[in-house]
Amino acid sequence: MTKKDYYHILGLDKDASPEDIKKAYRSLAKKYHPDISKEANAENKFKEVQEAYSVLGDASKKSNYDRFGDASDNGFSGFGGGGFDGFDSFGDSFFSSFGDIFGNQQTKKPSYDKKVEMTISFMDAVLGANKTIEITVEADCRVCHGKGAVSNQDVITCKRCGGNGQIITEQRTFLGNIRSRQVCPNCSGKGQEIKNKCYACHGQKRQKVKQSATFNIPAGIQEGMSLQVPGKGNFVPLSNNQKRRRSILLTFNSASS
């Protein structure tokens, strides 16, 4: 397979400095960006430019490419003939290192619980950027620490089910009386009820709080692309009384200039 000449794609000599590489990429990416260029093959050229910069703009990959003609450590091509992975469709999410790829996991329940739309500048879309945003998430109540009660003594055994979380109901039918188990409606199956509810969360155990989330926008992002950022969404209680945070899904709108 013919190796791509990334220096030629960016219009550079092999002794080009990092600043020269960045400057050439900035110019060509703006020229061929699909949201700007009217050329018929602009998208393919943009992908080539993006691919070239992803190698030459990274010191480690550039070193491998200069020595072996390939950016990967093992000497095999990391790109192949299919273009730059992750940018084949405006609607696809990308960069699996940020979490599951959205849109390709139709049978799975999404691991994110916050959707955020964000408008970024054109040059941030072309070159990438580090951003911090403020989001509202659900977390344990800061007053009762997730108990939902004024004190530990106010969390008592459910009087309806006796702490079992289930009740037995009996229904008369033409076949006779039928007994069945169902989730206790008083405690929702938890086996406990709250005598005096927390004044801050009103027994809900959770509150909405504002927190900051910092993430990297990959260079070359296009209109409508999404990025899944793990560990920045709502706090989710686990069965062992621990907590984990779900993801947020960022969808980008790029300013045209």
Curated annotation (Swiss-Prot):
Compartment annotation: Cytoplasm
InterPro entries: DnaJ_C (IPR002939), DnaJ_domain (IPR001623), DnaJ_domain_CS (IPR018253), HSP40/DnaJ_pept-bd (IPR008971), HSP_DnaJ_Cys-rich_dom (IPR001305), HSP_DnaJ_Cys-rich_dom_sf (IPR036410), J_dom_sf (IPR036869)
GO cellular component, one term: cytoplasm
UniProt cross-references to Gene3D superfamilies, sorted A to Z: DnaJ domain (1.10.287.110), Heat shock protein DnaJ, cysteine-rich domain (2.10.230.10), Urease metallochaperone UreE, N-terminal domain (2.60.260.20)
A GO molecular-function descriptor: zinc ion binding
Domain notes: The J domain is necessary and sufficient to stimulate DnaK ATPase activity. Zinc center 1 plays an important role in the autonomous, DnaK-independent chaperone activity of DnaJ. Zinc center 2 is essential for interaction with DnaK and for DnaJ activity.
PANTHER family: DNAJ HOMOLOG 1, MITOCHONDRIAL-RELATED
Family of this protein: Belongs to the DnaJ family.
Name used for this protein in its record: Chaperone protein DnaJ
